[in-house]
């Protein structure tokens, strides 16, 4: 489904128009970073991309972050199909992951079932409904409710959360 159609159905025609006109908050933030969103991209299943990120996590947070950056740029800016094995495996190779191992991981029904379970848990326990999603807590106060929010946020949001946690 085209992203504009998806946005109109989920958030209403104003969200779709904002995405088309590139005047929305997210587009403005992205433009400051030299990123232009492809408003012709297609919405599709993200389970395999989540499985690939899961695979990358076994090589450490830095490798995982490198991969996520490649995936985000490919999908949001270049309009690559996030459910395409071709795109996902190119991204894996780009960050130095083994293509055959990555393919085996993303095509594994057991891995997909586990990752779907983790996604469902994130939705039910933390209200995760999109990316990016942030959960910030003070580990020295484990009984205190963590802060959880989705979407692009200005630096002031993070500063405010960190100040409240200290």
List each language-model region with its residue ranges:
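C-terminal cap of thioredoxin/glutaredoxin-like
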Residues: 54-166
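Structural alpha/beta surface segment adjacent to cysteine/selenocysteine redox centers
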Residues: 1-75, 79
